[in-house]
Design a protein with these regions (language model features):
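Conserved P-loop
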Residues: 41-130
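A generic secondary-structure signal marking the coil-to-beta-strand transition
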Residues: 32, 63, 168, 268-269
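Conserved GTP-binding G-domain of TRAFAC-class P-loop NTPases and closely related GTPase folds
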Residues: 216-300
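N-terminal pre-Walker A segment at the start of P-loop NTPase domains
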Residues: 1-23, 71
């Protein structure tokens, strides 16, 4: 086959990454769409809660929301995440709308804060100038007074620990079979567009389910947009085969099955598949702390 290069038609990818939040080397990228699949009592809630806790301890997240009908039964699991009671949401048909409205409200507050900071800096500059007070526009002084600058000259304080666009993580737990899973609830749309809501503020999502692809499992569009998958012990060969067909990468079915068996051979253990790994060898893990190096990666 002969080829001929055409000058000036090379595609230039955008500089902006799909994952805009910096994370430590061994923590997955954000914003993520995480799916955790495993039987009831298998450890999904504990695993996801621990991952979110790690992000919080690194100062990466500002707020955690939870959609679940069983929070009070599982309070001990989620307590380290310091979830505000107003951010614990029942899995109703309006739950997604509630989440989006909360993210949009945070974005609006951030925008207002940015304006307030600019005006505060202008006020400080004005106060340090030699301009006589009587010569300042009265309407401007009234605006500064309404903002409290005349009574308190200290710099305005943002409501979260770090001044930045709010970083929010949503956990969806024990919600299969509820109104949240109704096609009209907007859940699928949220999972597809999660990085773009509230004018690009975005949100990370962890969705915990008992079945990956069965009738009561995860909708295919959500599976196809997953960035991080946690698979717990599963004795169904049909389910494992289905998962392999969708996410098996360059592994043979036998290699995938052996890797899955190794990753899940301890109580509450699970296999992770990162679809946006920072390095090729970071794609597969046993739990979060052990990388599983595939033959194709090891040989490179």
């Amino acid at each position: 086959m002969k080829t001929k290069q055409v000058f000036g038609l090379k595609i230039q990818p955008p500089k902006k990454s799909a994952f805009m939040i910096e994370t430590p080397e061994n923590l997955p990228k954000l914003h993520m769409l995480l799916l955790a699949s495993g039987k009831r009592g298998g450890g999904k809630s504990v695993a996801v809660s621990n991952l979110v806790r790690m992000y919080l301890e690194q100062g990466i997240l500002d707020r955690v929301m939870l959609i679940s009908p069983t929070y009070w039964s599982n309070k001990e699991i989620f307590e380290p995440l310091n979830i505000d009671e107003d951010d614990i949401i029942e899995p109703s048909k309006d739950a997604v709308k509630t989440v989006v409205e909360k993210v949009e409200a945070d974005k609006a507050e951030w925008d207002d804060f940015q304006v307030r900071i600019k005006k505060w800096k202008d006020f400080q500059k004005l106060m340090k100038s030699d301009k006589p007070m009587w010569s300042i526009n009265p309407e401007l002084l009234l605006e500064y007074m309404d903002m409290g600058f005349l009574d308190n000259a200290e710099r305005p304080v943002w409501k979260y620990a770090q001044e930045r666009l709010p970083r929010i993580f949503l956990i969806i737990d024990d919600s299969m079979g509820t109104d949240l899973m109704n096609p009209k609830s907007g859940l699928t749309n949220l999972c597809i567009k999660h990085r773009h809501i509230a004018e690009g503020t975005g949100i990370s999502i962890a969705m915990l389910v008992q079945s990956y692809s069965a009738q009561q499992g995860i909708a295919r569009p959500i599976r196809e947009n997953c960035t991080f998958l946690c698979l717990f012990k599963n004795n169904s060969e049909q389910q494992i085969k289905k998962i392999y067909e969708e996410v098996g990468d360059k592994l043979t079915e036998e290699q995938f099955a052996k890797m899955f068996e190794y990753a899940t051979n301890e109580p509450y253990s699970f296999m992770c598949i990162d679809f946006a790994p920072k390095k090729p060898e970071y794609k597969f893990r046993k739990r979060f702390e052990e990388y599983l190096i595939t033959p194709s990666v090891a040989d490179t």
